[in-house]
Regions:
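A conserved ligand/cofactor-binding region detector
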Residues: 1-816
Length: 816
């Protein structure tokens, strides 16, 4: 039912008054002289007040019902902008828009002033953000725990086509959504030594005498669920020194030395993923991971003891989910807290630890399963290294007692890697210390059992399970694409907004309605025009909104194969030049994504993309049939502009390497067609959407694995069989796209030919053929838009609400 006009008018008036109140008394500005940023802060604070009311109610209910709590530990939370997200979930978006209109303030203009919170990088952090929102929507009592990075990863700029990392200053104007909890402080220790002592009962105990201690200070951000149903807490930790100023040294004239401890402590929460190519960088990463894990575990144990007489029922009252290997030191830290601080016997402490912890694996790349040098661990966390040795000893002894003496198997399941220097295997630690280990797509979970955790799976065959990732439709449909949302609501009714997971399938019959397909195409064109304007503003390239928008936006990594896309781009460019008379499909190739600061090969791929763009976009013989764009500084807000405008979604990772992917789901939900390999969640998308409604190509995971076993990474055979591929590689290698430095890409191409680890060349011809199928379908608009509608209609299963319901039912036991 629609709201009564009088009630609606009152709500608008109340919100307008609340904004004016915040502008005057919280921001300290008169409406006549307020800047746009002052208005943003006032609006955010007014919205936050509404969130706090729901927050307090939800928190009180959770305590009153002794509801089981979920603690989600993640090094990243890519939450993006929160103004529209919060207003939309509270049902206040239209109210706020009308209220501000009466003040001659444009909410859309104000929205753009909010910086993206620099708390993550890619899919891992965005998944965590979607999960937090879904947990609130489903009424699960949850806390997210992470780090309040002052500068995040980095702001990506392009200097002569090269990625340049610049400081991200997202907190310059403060953060109106957060509450500093100055009273919530925990000591976090590093270094020092461990002493064996006898306690009052004559029992030997270990005492850690740390060499350094910093403080973890809590900052809370409310996370509101759909319709304001419930509000959970994202608690982020900021590192502070124990002593802000060494006054004696300062007065002695050592002004820099007086604040050296402050700089060292605060560096922990300064940036996300500091480069780990140096020993100092590795040390800082380990400090970060332990810092937030220790603070979070101390905090949740304190909360538990406020409600329960002891910790012996911890697994019944709390579920701790480790998002990837970054928080896996939690296994050793929880054992330390239980054994050393709460004096729980080792065997019981281990039972509680395993019963409480669960681990999500996000990668099959061995190099991405973190390992730390034993020497570094012994120096930084000596007590934890003792605990890890002891866990490993019990583990190996138990296996031997069961008759397992195979040296290779014992070496594979050990927590200590002995090859190439002794290192602690954090993936194995997380596996052993958790009662559940899940993958994030059906294929990924299957491959976990046969690759990275093959031997551990044989020992614990019930531990690995699958929870295919999902996305929140509130962010990636309602907020990112309001035009499409309005269309869907008109077609399916307003109930869709509360149950998209169940009701989207009712859209299937509309795919055969010409009028609906026409509407669908029109709303896409609207989004493409908006993106074309952004492209013009940011990189100065004019694109045709009626061209096919072919999009690959994600972290730059060799296994994601942006290089394969670029090889196709060059091949297409050459084909258009050689045969301009063909009825080519006008196409805009759109790339975006960041490369890790120390990842040279990925940064070279970005440079290649920009070099190709420069040549193609300035070649008059192409007649605008092909444009290439690399949009810098990809983040959530840019994704919200790109995804609704995409016609073709590139999901072309080497099969068996992408754990799941979630951009595939976001594009599919908005009606983009997918060109991709049978990798990650593409497999399940294929099952839901239908293989006929996607462009699947390339080697399967099984074929890739067979090549790996055979060591078959040479590209010579593929190149010899494909004149098109040979011409492309020759053009890049010879400097056609790098006339200022003709040898710039010689190493890249020679490396590809000699050892094509990610099988770019092997899949090239199949990829070219799939792209030709794309062009054929685009030439038949009524069929293209029929398939586009079907993609949207069949994406309901990929809701993060479904994913979280599965976690809560199968792993956390947290749904009533």
């Amino acid at each position: 039912m629609s709201q009564e006009p009088k009630a609606r008018d009152a709500e608008v008036a109340d919100f307008r008054a609340a904004v004016l109140d915040k502008l005057t008394y919280a921001v300290g500005k008169d409406p006549e002289h307020a800047f746009d940023h002052d208005w943003f802060e006032a609006i955010a604070l007014a919205a936050r007040d509404h969130m706090v009311d729901h927050w307090m109610d939800h928190t009180r209910q959770a305590y009153r019902r002794s509801q089981k709590r979920v603690y989600y530990l993640s090094l990243e939370f890519l939450i993006g902008r929160l103004l529209y997200d919060s207003l939309s979930n509270l049902g206040l978006l239209d109210v706020a828009r009308d209220a501000l209109e009466g003040l001659n303030v444009d909410l859309e203009r104000i929205r753009l002033l909010e910086p993206d919170a620099a708390l993550g990088n890619g899919g891992l952090g965005r998944l965590a953000a979607c999960f937090m929102e879904s947990m609130s929507t489903l009424g699960i009592a949850a806390h997210g725990y992470g780090i309040r990075y002052e500068h995040g990863l980095f702001r990506q700029a392009m200097v002569d086509g090269w990625q340049q990392e610049q400081t991200e200053n997202w907190l310059d104007f403060g953060n109106p959504w957060e509450f500093e909890r100055a009273e919530v402080i925990y000591p976090i220790s590093f270094g020092g030594s461990v002493e064996t002592v006898n306690d009052t009962h004559g029992q030997q105990r270990q005492v850690w005498w740390p060499g350094e201690t910093v403080r973890a200070v809590a900052y809370d951000t409310p996370v509101v669920g759909w319709r304001g149903s419930s509000v959970n807490t994202l608690r982020l930790w900021r590192a502070r020194a124990l002593e802000e100023l060494h006054l004696e040294r300062f007065n002695a004239g050592d002004h820099l030395g007086a604040v050296a401890e402050v700089a060292r402590a605060e560096s922990i929460s300064r940036v996300l993923y500091p480069a780990d190519s140096t020993e100092a960088g590795q040390e800082l990463r380990l400090r970060q991971e332990y810092f937030f894990v220790s603070a979070s575990l101390q905090d949740l144990l304190r909360r538990h003891l406020n409600m329960h007489k002891d910790l012996l029922n911890l697994p019944d009252a709390a579920a701790i989910q480790l998002n990837d290997t970054h928080p896996s030191i939690a296994v050793a830290e929880l054992m330390r807290l239980l054994v050393d601080q709460h004096e729980i016997p080792w065997e019981k402490a281990w039972e509680l630890t395993v019963g409480t912890l669960a681990y999500t694996n996000h990668t099959l790349l061995p190099e991405a399963l973190e390992t730390w040098p034993v020497a570094l661990m012994e120096r930084m966390l000596p007590r934890h290294m003792q605990i890890i040795y002891l866990i490993n000893a019990y583990h190996i002894d138990a296996l031997r007692a069961k008759g397992l003496h195979d040296f290779d198997v014992l070496r594979a399941v050990s927590l200590i890697e002995e090859d190439n220097g002794r290192r602690v295997r954090m993936g194995n630690l997380a596996f052993l210390g958790s009662h559940s280990v899940n993958g994030v797509s059906a294929l990924h979970s299957k491959l976990m059992k046969s690759t990275v955790f093959a031997e551990l799976h044989k020992l614990y065959p019930q531990r690995i399970n699958n929870k295919t990732n999902g996305i929140t439709f509130r962010r990636w449909l309602y907020q990112a694409n309001p035009q499409l949302t309005a269309m869907l609501v008109e077609a399916l009714g307003p109930e869709l907004l509360d149950d998209p997971e169940g009701r989207l399938a009712n859209l299937v019959p509309f795919a055969d309605k010409g009028s609906f397909r026409k509407q669908f195409a029109a709303q896409r064109l609207h989004s493409k025009r908006a993106l074309a304007s952004i492209i013009q503003d940011r990189v100065g390239v004019t694109v045709n909104p009626e061209a096919l928008f072919d999009v690959q936006v994600k972290r730059i990594h060799e296994y994601k194969r942006q290089l394969l896309n670029l090889l196709h781009t060059v091949a297409l460019y050459q084909a258009i030049r050689n045969d301009p008379g063909i009825n080519w499909v006008p196409r805009v190739k759109i790339f975006a994504g960041k490369a890790a600061a120390s990842y040279h090969q990925a940064k070279l791929i970005i440079k290649l993309a920009n070099d190709i763009a420069r040549v193609v976009n300035n070649d008059p013989t192409v007649r605008g049939l092909l444009k290439v764009v690399f949009l810098p500084n990809y983040n959530v807000s840019l994704a919200e502009s790109i995804i609704p405008a995409a016609d073709l979604s590139e999901q072309i990772s080497t099969a068996g390497y992408e754990a799941s992917g979630t951009s595939n789901m976001k594009f599919g939900l908005n009606g983009a067609l997918t060109i991709g390999t049978l990798d990650g969640a593409n497999v399940e998308m294929c099952e839901q959407v239908g293989a006929d409604n996607m462009f699947i190509f390339g080697l399967t995971a099984q074929q890739v694995e067979a090549r790996k076993r055979a060591g078959d990474f040479g590209a010579s055979a593929a190149i010899a069989a494909s004149n098109r591929l040979s011409d492309v590689l020759q053009a890049i290698r010879s400097g056609v796209f790098s006339s200022d430095d003709p040898g710039r890409y010689a190493g890249l191409i020679d490396g590809l030919i000699a050892h094509d680890r990610f099988l770019v060349c092997a899949d090239f011809d199949a990829y070219w053929d799939a792209q030709r199928r794309v062009e054929e379908l685009w030439h038949t608009p009524q069929e293209w838009w029929r398939v586009a509608v079907l993609n949207t209609a069949r994406m309901g299963w990929f809701s993060s609400d479904r994913t979280i319901r599965e976690y809560a039912t199968d792993i956390w036991k947290a749904l009533d």
